Every structure is written in structure tokens, then in C-alpha cells.
């Protein structure tokens, strides 16, 4: 009996260490039951914990969090992404779905649903919801995209100038 208790304690300790390690990467982790429209917080930043609490109804709390946390231009995308009533279908042939969004603070995040459990028919019943800060990568990506756009514009201008020069030269000759 004592060995069984020690083994159980060792398993719990290992699970806590795993959650702690993953929580360094994701600022929020929820376990969600799609059948009962419920979630349970595994780990979250204090501001989100205050907003959503330890557990609740997905349809209610995720709507409240989205309305208060997501930038206006990403509201519709996130309403669709966070819609738990369509999630099982979206995950039918996949193990995860994700999207990027900007918070009202201006910080970029990536949200992801990961399949945790399927029923005997293969339908998704439970998922993990995780989100992480991708602000540095997103800003770098946007800056690179802008630099590429500028370079392409400059190349186009140079090409037009060269074409115009050659046209005038051939006309003069």
C-alpha cells in the first residue's frame, strides 16, 4: 500500500513538472469538454484567471474573454475560432487547429486547440486550449514582409526607369 502511494505521488509530481514546463511556453492552458460545454483551467496568467475563473461554460466565458481581450479587427476571426459548437467538426481529420490574433494591448498571440480525447466513433470530445505570446516573431515577420514589399517596389521603379531609358535611347537612335 505504501509503495502504491509513493508511485502515485511520483506520478503526480511528474505531471506537475510537465505542466510547469509547458506553462513556460503557453500563458494559458485549459482542458475543455465539448460535450458538456465546460472548461477547467490548468494554468493561466493572473489577468485571465480573474476574467474566466477556474472553470465554467465555454460558450459564456470564452465570449466574455474574447470581447474584453481581442483587438476589434480580430473579433470575428476569433469568434469563429473559439466556437466550441463547431470545434469537433473542424478537428474531424486533424489533431490541432490554430490561429494568430492581436490583443487589445497590441501584443500578438497564437491560440491552438489540441485534440485530447475522441469517443469510440472517432469524434472529438475533449481538447486542450493553449495560447502563447508570439509578439517578437510576428513583429519580425511583419518587418521582413514590409522590407520585401519595399525592395520589390524599388526594383519595379528601377525596371521602369531602365525601360523608359531604353525606349528614349532607341527613339533617339
PLM segments and residue spans:
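Short loop/turn elements at sensory-signaling interfaces that couple input to output
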Residues: 111-138
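Primarily the dimerization/phosphotransfer
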Residues: 23, 147-173
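PAS/Per-ARNT-Sim sensory domains
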Residues: 58-86, 93-94
Amino acid at each position: 500500500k505504501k509503495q502504491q502511494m509513493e508511485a502515485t505521488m511520483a506520478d503526480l509530481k511528474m505531471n506537475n513538472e510537465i505542466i510547469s514546463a509547458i506553462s513556460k511556453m503557453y500563458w494559458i492552458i485549459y482542458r475543455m469538454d465539448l460535450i458538456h460545454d465546460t472548461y477547467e483551467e490548468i494554468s493561466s496568467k493572473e489577468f485571465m484567471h480573474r476574467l474566466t475563473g477556474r472553470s465554467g461554460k465555454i460558450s459564456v466565458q470564452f465570449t466574455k474573454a474574447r470581447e474584453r481581450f481581442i483587438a476589434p479587427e480580430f473579433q470575428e476571426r476569433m469568434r469563429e475560432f473559439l466556437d466550441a459548437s463547431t470545434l469537433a467538426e473542424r478537428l474531424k481529420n486533424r489533431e490541432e487547429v490554430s490561429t494568430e490574433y492581436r490583443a487589445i494591448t497590441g501584443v500578438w498571440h497564437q491560440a491552438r486547440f489540441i485534440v485530447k480525447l475522441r469517443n469510440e466513433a472517432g469524434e472529438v470530445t475533449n481538447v486542450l486550449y493553449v495560447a502563447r505570446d508570439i509578439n517578437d516573431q510576428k513583429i519580425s515577420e511583419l518587418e521582413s514582409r514590409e522590407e520585401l514589399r519595399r525592395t520589390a517596389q524599388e526594383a519595379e521603379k528601377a525596371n521602369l526607369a531602365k525601360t523608359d531609358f531604353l525606349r528614349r535611347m532607341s527613339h533617339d537612335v
